[in-house]
Amino acid sequence: MKQIALLVVVLSLSVVAESLGGRLSAEELSSLPYSQSLNFDFGPGKVAPGYTQVLQTTTYSKELGYGFEPGADVTCVDRGGRDALRSDLCTSDQPFFFSVALPEGNYEVTITFGDQSAETVTTVKAELRRLMLEEVRTAAGKFTTRSFTVNVRTPQISSGGEVKLKDREKTSELWAWDEKLTLEFNNERPSISAIEIVKVTAPTLFLLGDSTVCDQPLEPYNSWGQMLTRFFRPGIAIANHAESGESLRSSLSARRLDKVLSLMKPGDYLFIQYGHNDEKEKGEGVGAYTTYKASLKHFVEEARKCGGIPVLITPVQRRTFDAQGKITNSHGDYPAAVRQVAKEENVPLIDLHAMSGVLYEAWGPEASKRSFAPNDGTHHNNYGSYELARCIIEAIKANKLGLAKYLITSTAPFDPAHPDPVDSFNVPASPQVTAVKPPGS
């Protein structure tokens, strides 16, 4: 992986872009210094100074280093006018993807939305369906810009070696590890006029956990980790290193913790939620109050050595109701063990086990099915994971964590006893679908 030189000033790409006729090479894309912006002007009209033109025929390749992912059915039009950036756009009536080759790191992405002649409605997701912008609406003739901070990662570990990826991480989950940023544009009429990307030294919130936390690649599965991004303003990146089927010990063996620690800076956060798969481990001395607690303490200690701030999260409940419509604990002693470690090590605790129980009971045995994937009592759909992410946000505020200053202030308070109506949920599904359950249960 090419290393990026640190610059302390913002550099313009106008000279490079103009010298190449508005086109950047893949090599230049992959060797950008901090604070140097990549600017893309979408549409066939006049290209704004310092921007690279993107046409509907601009298909991503390693050689080019940017473009629409294969299969994109987009229309790029020029409306005319003096404003080169806003006079043209690319749009579609179905989801499409745009990728840029980028080195590992945190990036601030700014997107210009709008159309001189029509209303636009756009939802933006990044990498493996991380929800970045829920719904951006513009009236005909109006434009708006929105920004977010996103993390791009690779398997390589700076001290040597790499994360031991599972087979699915090399196929359906490859966008999480492929040295490029992929953006999904979705909703009724997604339309974009410009994208600006700049590498930043923003703090990072790292996530480690299992299938209920990770970035699920395919519909109808989803996790709270990939919905959490929607509730943070620019200035902090969320790096989700959770993976389906993982326990604390298997994540350690796969070097996922090593990867996080190699990137962690003082003041970064590490949210840790395991249990679903740990409770299935067998062997002499294996259990909630032995190996599980010891592993939790190890994760906490290692994060603190790097100046990181660990936060423990109890495992989310499964959909297990009794005859009275109450949730039964399917995790045994594991939630209590997390609470013990939090108390013993003076670590902030997010009791998602308790909050999700309140949430499920508010829905009830039948209505709660609408928050899970079909025939699955463990893995959530988009709506269910969105509501769980709202639980996490409320716990961040209740714990008075420092990263609360990065939360979007317009988000209304949330009470899991009174969840959002499912019929009002409007995050569109991504186009990739599977009938295969994620590993773990």
Regions found by a protein language model. Give the residues of each.
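Bacterial N-terminal signal peptides
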Residues: 5-18
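Compositionally biased, intrinsically disordered or flexible polar/acidic segments
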Residues: 20-219
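N-terminal pre-domain segments of enzymes
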Residues: 24-35, 46, 409, 413-423, ...
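Conserved beta-strand scaffold positions in the cores of enzyme catalytic domains, especially
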Residues: 39, 238-240, 346-349
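Short, structured coil segments at secondary-structure junctions
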Residues: 126-127, 232-234, 306, 345
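Conserved SGNH/GDSL esterase-like catalytic core that processes O-acyl groups on lipids
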Residues: 177, 188-190, 198-206, 212-301, ...
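Alpha-helical cap/lid subdomain in secreted, periplasmic
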Residues: 255-409, 428-441
